[in-house]
């Protein structure tokens, strides 16, 4: 795999982007990776490589660049948890959308990134960004995957799940049955809306906890394997077909 980290210009200042893609010139279809709350840790980088092995140009932006460039959670102590949640709650979806716009403006400068239909995948708070992206840029992003989603079903009038019924691309949402942080039972509306799509699928994975899709302490092999199996089918259909 070829990996690179760049600093690009965003409306809010310098912003890091990290790319994992196959060796060679490409161009390869683009999959935008929205990392989870703990930041772009080693488990996330390994997960990006897993997707890139399917033949994709996988790129993520530094979600927390306004506060702490390339933050990656260190341990699970109270202070670190407080810091991480502060970053999660302190970064708005409007800011993420602004960052995505900067990323999309930069992509044509890399000849390895293919133009045309794109996919996106997100974890935890990143799954919320997936739903907001298919809402705002559904014509460009033809496949979306959200694993162990956070803050996707709320009582607010702009709750991300409300965008699902109008999406015409492929969407996969995966929950863990053991997830008490963001349980599937709190996301019934999202599950029902996803399963009602022509090309949508929501699943609850038995025994999997929050974080099951990222290599690390909460990784759940069976749930991850099933989720990535479905993700690959959707990406291949929408981006390579």
Language-model features: locations:
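N-terminal cap/leader regions of alpha/beta-hydrolase-fold enzymes
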Residues: 1-241
